Amino acid sequence: MIKTFDVLVVGSGIAGVYTALNLNSNLNILLICKEGLKDCNSYLAQGGISSALNSDDFPSYIEDTLKAGNYKNDLDAVQTLVSESKKNIQRLIDYGVPFDRKKDGSLLYTREGGHSTFRIAHVKDETGKYIMETLYERLKERNNIKIIEHCKLVDIIRKDNKCLGGICIHNGQEIQIHAKCTILATGGLGGLFKSTTNFPFLTGDGIAIALKHNVAIKDINYLQLHPTVLYEPDCIGKRLLLSESLRGEGGKLKNLDNEEFVDSLKPRDVVSKAILEEIKKHPDKPYVYLDLTHLDKNFLMNRFPFLYNACAERGYYMEKDLLPVAPAHHYAMGGIKINLYGETSLNSLYALGEAACTGVHGNNRLASNSLLEGIVFGYRCAKKINSELFVTNNSSYPSKEDVIDYLKERVDENYAKLLDY
């Protein structure tokens, strides 16, 4: 089966969906996702989304991001992220995202590890869910965007140094999708780890496909642990992340002797390392405690309803019980190398979100910068594609001959592998 579109978007997280929404409405767009539409890490995000409070906050926010990333960040990418944060948050508000607000109507901000001030917008403790639900509603209002769920990208179609679309499997059938532009927003690779905060099916598919075609990759060795994941010895795979905002609102990390052993609001790598050092002292009890018992029950229930209930279901009550926590894989800072417009080293192939790497995070992402990265660079990517397709007179679809040539090469390659076997 062959389908033809102007733009193919692979991934239903914030990067893919936000980009699709900002592409011109006269473009014919296909968005596919490996599982269901809502099955993405963006939907799981709890703490919030960072934003510069105003232009005076730029230097501080830039420094916080650089410091968290151990100054291995790409400075241009960091400056872009920070300077374009507020206007993209406003776009989310315009879409209808119901961020928590103060009595005067202004945004209510929280603080997380590595931030020098309160600059994280949120919706209770399910920010990702509320953002994504809003974006999905806007997505379904767009007649020019077609969505196919449970559709797995297995390869891209390539001719010379240009991407011509993708090859997918849907309901057991192979589909060739011809597209002028292809966007890989396939998420991270947490599903490869035994202990992770990610969905198990997030296995770095987009990065693997890029590697196969010698598309440039950057900082793939930069992987992040989240310090506070609920310790459940019988749980394998996706675990319950206890948001950094719990510490931002006063939670403290304590060892088994009930002693505070680390500044709970240090960057994630620092806190994770400190926890692992504590765990080495008692390998039979591989956890430390997150202490929220000094906080008011009603505050905890109202500010963190999802986490309060999730912990209660497991027999822990935040206002009276110490919560056992340990680090788990959370995020990949590296990925497909892109510029500030999402362009990869292969023409007409773009990448965004956790699958991509601008270098904005350095070797350790600052808390709540991931959702922001998705929308800032997603918006820039959309505008770049809009401009490219307009300037080139709507470009041209890959020719039948180009696609046939690629498929012949693919058949020959697989046949050679079979002979070798």
Which stretches of residues belong to each language-model region?
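Conserved N-terminal glycine-rich FAD pyrophosphate-binding loop of Rossmann-like flavoproteins
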Residues: 35-66, 70, 237-238
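A glycine-rich dinucleotide-binding beta-alpha-beta segment and adjacent secondary-structure elements
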Residues: 148-149, 154-163, 167-169, 303-357, ...
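Glycine- and aromatic-enriched mobile tails/lids
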Residues: 1-5, 36-38, 44-51, 91, ...
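Glycine-rich loop(s) and the adjacent beta-strand/alpha-helix scaffold that form part
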Residues: 181-234, 371-375
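An anion/pyrophosphate-binding glycine-rich loop and adjacent beta-alpha core
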Residues: 209, 215-316, 384, 390
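Conserved redox-cofactor binding core of oxidoreductases
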Residues: 94-174, 185, 229-233, 253
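N-terminal Rossmann-like FAD-binding beta1-loop-alpha1 element of flavoenzymes
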Residues: 7-31
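Short beta-strand to alpha-helix junction loop
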Residues: 75-86, 119-137, 148, 197-204, ...
